[in-house]
Amino acid sequence: MHEYIERVVDLTDPNETELLNISPDEARQRMLGGAPESVRNFDGSFALVAKNGKAVKLARSLDRPLRYFLAKQIEGPALIVAHRIDAIRKWLEEQGFGDQFHPYYTRMVPAHYLVTIQLVGCPDPDPTYERFFNPVRNKYSTDLDPIGHDYIAALKSEVRKWIERVPENEPIGCCFSGGIDSGAVFLATYSVMRELGCDLGRL
């Protein structure tokens, strides 16, 4: 009986994954062995691929794109994973599979889901989706003050983590359009820098 050889081609850039509380290898082990909720504890920015036998698991944070394409080979399926569609297309063309490519055949891993693909033969991918981010709905009343307080507290917490990782001799920049969103980020950054005793001239 012919034994298919499954292949995973990971074209993602490992330097674009920035996890603050866990290493990428530990994160992949959790993806393979833990409940989807364990991915919820990843603190940072990530787009990860983990493989165990014929099972491939994919997960990403909201700010990191992660696309995949299942190429058909005689010896078995090849799952190509990348941040961008053009990287997938380039690899297929270099390997002689360019005629299989079409942008519609690529899929984006949805943020906040642990996606599992079984590399069995060469069917169309039939992934399963397990959500790892499940915020509580209707948690607040219609009073805007506690909502605003928690929103700004969460924003400042993330800004603080970022600032603490920037060398003290480097400037700190914020994209500021003058709108309420970028204005909130700018003011939160200013506030955190004051609390940390940073030189405000860096901002």
Predicted regions, residues:
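Cysteine-centered catalytic environments shared across enzyme families
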Residues: 1-203
